[in-house]
């Protein structure tokens, strides 16, 4: 499965929860996660998407750590099963 299909799947699942999964590409900053997921209740999750079996690059790991240090949740998904698990956990928590 291509990364773009995983990304589209994430977007659809988040929208079914009543949220938004915006493409996130701040000007002049490289290595940030692909999507900023905004959920009802003010929840924010930054998501890096990868093709199956691929890992985040060093700079992407660094940016993820920066966001985590600020208190944000950051996830990296390389398959739809991980997205389904996230959505299930969100539904259970609500």
Residue ranges of model-derived segments:
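Catalytic phosphate/metal-binding cores of nucleic-acid and nucleotide-processing enzymes, i.e., regions
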Residues: 1-94
């Amino acid at each position: 499965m291509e990364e773009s299909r995983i990304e589209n799947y994430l977007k659809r699942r988040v929208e079914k929860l009543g949220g938004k999964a915006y493409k996130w590409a701040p000007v002049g900053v490289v290595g940030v996660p692909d999507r900023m997921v905004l959920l009802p209740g003010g929840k924010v999750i930054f998501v890096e998407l990868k093709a199956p079996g691929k890992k985040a690059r060093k700079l992407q790991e660094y940016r993820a750590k920066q966001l985590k240090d600020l208190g944000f949740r950051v996830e990296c998904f390389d398959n739809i099963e991980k997205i389904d698990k996230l959505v299930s956990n969100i539904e259970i928590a609500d």
